């Protein structure tokens, strides 16, 4: 049975942010591509090409008012236990994940901000 584009979009829309990030990673591995948009920089003077950053760090800047929701989001994103996630959230600013793709970093930032945290991508 062949799925239509509409069915695929509906299936993706029903997934959580974490599941979508995992799907993107699996697709990148399967097809040997990157979801990050390729940027071409043309220099006016000498032939110098600016390198686009491909690895990003997600930093929890502040837990916000709803620490419980942030701890749950951190646990889901990192796989840490309850105590480790709580300690990480309370020690903000703290690195949550390092060396991840831009798409994964953006998805994680969105998920944590929805829980009430202040997040930075570096």
Curated annotation (Swiss-Prot):
It holds the Pfam family Ribosomal_L12_N. Transmembrane segments: none annotated. Gene3D superfamilies: 3.30.1390.10, Single helix bin (1.20.5.710). The keyword Ribonucleoprotein applies. One of its GO terms (biological process) is translation. One of its GO terms (cellular component) is cytosolic large ribosomal subunit. InterPro entries: Ribosomal_bL12, Ribosomal_bL12_C, Ribosomal_bL12_C/ClpS-like, Ribosomal_bL12_oligo, Ribosomal_bL12_oligo_N_sf. Keywords: Ribonucleoprotein, Ribosomal protein. The keyword Ribosomal protein applies. One of its GO terms (molecular function) is mRNA binding. Belongs to the bacterial ribosomal protein bL12 family. Forms part of the ribosomal stalk which helps the ribosome interact with GTP-bound translation factors. Is thus essential for accurate translation. NCBIfam families: L12. HAMAP family: Ribosomal_bL12. Homodimer. Part of the ribosomal stalk of the 50S ribosomal subunit. Forms a multimeric L10(L12)X complex, where L10 forms an elongated spine to which 2 to 4 L12 dimers bind in a sequential fashion. Binds GTP-bound translation factors. This is Large ribosomal subunit protein bL12. It comes from Histophilus somni (strain 2336) (Haemophilus somnus). The lineage of its organism: Bacteria, Pseudomonadati, Pseudomonadota, Gammaproteobacteria, Pasteurellales.
């Amino acid at each position: 049975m062949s799925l239509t584009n509409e069915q695929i979009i509906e299936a993706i829309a029903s997934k959580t942010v974490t599941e979508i990030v995992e799907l993107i990673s699996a697709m990148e591995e399967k097809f040997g591509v990157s979801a990050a948009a390729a940027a071409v920089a043309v220099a006016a003077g000498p032939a110098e090409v600016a390198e686009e950053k491909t690895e990003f760090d997600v930093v929890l800047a502040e837990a916000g008012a709803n620490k419980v929701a942030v701890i749950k989001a951190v646990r889901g994103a990192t796989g840490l236990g309850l105590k480790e996630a709580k300690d990480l959230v309370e020690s903000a600013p703290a690195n949550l994940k390092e060396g991840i793709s831009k798409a994964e970093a953006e998805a994680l930032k969105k998920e944590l901000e929805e829980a009430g945290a202040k997040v930075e991508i570096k």
